[in-house]
Amino acid sequence: MAKPISMTLSTKSIQDAIKKLEQYRDSLQAKCDLLVSRLAQEGQTVAIQHISESPLGNTITVRVDKAPQLMTSNAILIATGKTVTSEDREPFYTLLAVEFGAGIFYNSKENPKAPELGFGVGTYPGQIHAFEDGWYYWDDKTETWRYTHGIKATMPMYNAEQQIIQQYVKIAREVFGGK
């Protein structure tokens, strides 16, 4: 981690020390970029695993947007789902269903972020079946009524966040070479 830089009070020694400091600064930026990339990859991997557990998983994509800047590194994990619209109903967002669940049958335990974010079982606008064991819905593709118990919340983004929180010290030590 710490790197000692020695110098004397000569012009050449001071210039060498400045050069070493600039190299150290540049290496810190590269290490910060690597840390952010590794943490984002860790989160993306966990999010994809949890998305794939849902029958709606094929409607969701996850990507990392990175924006390295001078002496700053950041990455944003972005999940995008499908919006299903139907006449006389509010839009249904597959990402929200996978993150927070739909229906009480599979979701007796809510996503821990639900109260903070205002989502979860029973919060879908105009919902009337959230606290029932199951319900029928009209499937426009097959033009039939289908029975469902709803969608289990696999919480991909919440679990990605938790994984990053659990792993950041370990990964930082690997990147920066600490013990």
Predicted regions and their residues:
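Short, Lys/Arg-rich flexible segments
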Residues: 1-89, 93-94, 100-179
